[in-house]
Amino acid sequence: MAVGLGPLPTLHPVAGFELGIASAGIKRPGRKDVVVMRCAEGSTVAGVFTLNAFCAAPVILAKKRVQNAVRYLLTNTGNANAGTGEPGLAAAERTTAKLAELTGVDASQILPYSTGVIGEPLPVEKIEGALQAALDDLSENNWEAAATGIMTTDTLPKGASRQFQHDGVTITVTGISKGAGMIRPNMATMLGYIATDAKVSRDVLQNLMLDGANKSFNRITIDGDTSTNDCCMLIATGKAALPEINRAEGELFAKLKQAVFEVCMDVAQAIVRDGEGATKFVTVEVNGGGNHQECLDVGYTVAHSPLIKTALFASDPNWGRILAAVGRAGVPDLDVSKIDVFLGEVCIASRGARAATYTEAQGSAVMQQEEITIRIELGRGDCSETIWTTDLSHEYVKINAEYRT
């Protein structure tokens, strides 16, 4: 079940960015599993990619080509084309070469993306056979269909959109994402595509994508596994009648940054809310750190703990597991006598021990909720970080045990 995730909001079209969807039948006959995205000529494209050393063939190719004048993005689901060696790289090149042949652009202007089962050969002929249908389907109004087309174990499509005014001109930022398992992005299986009609220089766009990912996609985790295929792309078509943003300053940049960050946050949190088998959406706040890294270390140790995640699933306020996780997070010279821990607004541990006013009934009441905040005060400094995660349910085990059967 998706926690607090409803139907897609209105996804505003972005001038100069079109999406087309078709069926290649990679995993299931008739399923629409190929998505082609066309960027208007002159668009700038930025991206962040997985840091997994076993990165997939399409990631290798996309990283090489993202500096070029990108015109198309090609995504397939049902097959990750990862762990496939040189044949996998050749397969990714073949699919982009076919799309180049059909569109008249150079293959170096096409970025490939794949998601699905790792270690199986990419069905190149099936993908090639679906490309013309995807091209025929291209439309600026196809965001919702594309959000569905990139899904794998997701139960719901994920998207967000923002618009703002500047000098009488409306600027749009719209994005979609997919992911429900193998989620612990580190850039950043997860894919994200965000487009705007603002005109932005590539350097500014790349830094905007990095900052946006670090505050959203790189702060979510479901199971601690970093995918081989994670990518998040930001495209600026330049179709809005406003000057180019070539510096990270000024009112227009500030408005765009806020819109991009909000879209990133919405689609990143949607991945957590749709986590495989998730019944709880959990916010882990770590405050009072001596530096940001130790806040992240504590936050991720808590978020990844199987004992904490199963307690969350059982609605069991077993707060000792939280203390144990904080203690093993590797923070040097940690003074446990300064640590406070809260479940929601309920103080469960004060100065490293059970809070005098805490009762089991208070903790149980919080743990029964679908959305829970675990707040940890380290008492070491003024740095803070926030991680979003899920519980760990029987359904998560079932989904992943049966993934290939």
Curated annotation (Swiss-Prot):
| GO cellular component terms given for this protein | cytoplasm
Which residues bear the site annotation Cleavage?
A: A188, T189
The protein's matches in SUPFAM superfamilies, at most eight in alphabetical order, are given as: DmpA/ArgJ-like
- Presence of the UniProt keyword Metal-binding in the record: no
- Keyword Amino-acid biosynthesis annotated: yes
Report the InterPro entries cross-referenced here. Answer: Arg_biosynth_ArgJ, ArgJ-like_dom_sf, ArgJ_beta_C
* Compartments, as annotated in UniProt: Cytoplasm
Lineage, top-rank taxon, reads: Bacteria
Q: What residues does substrate bind to?
A: T152, K178, T189, E276, N400, T405
Q: Which UniProt keywords are given for this protein, alphabetically ordered?
A: Acyltransferase, Amino-acid biosynthesis, Arginine biosynthesis, Autocatalytic cleavage, Cytoplasm, Multifunctional enzyme, Transferase
Q: Chief location of this protein?
A: cytoplasm
According to its UniProt entry, the function of this protein is described as: Catalyzes two activities which are involved in the cyclic version of arginine biosynthesis: the synthesis of N-acetylglutamate from glutamate and acetyl-CoA as the acetyl donor, and of ornithine by transacetylation between N(2)-acetylornithine and glutamate.
Quaternary context: Heterotetramer of two alpha and two beta chains.
Q: Which HAMAP family match?
A: ArgJ
**Under which name does UniProt file this protein?**
Arginine biosynthesis bifunctional protein ArgJ
What organism is recorded for this protein? Pseudomonas fluorescens (strain Pf0-1)
Q: Name the gene for this chain.
A: argJ
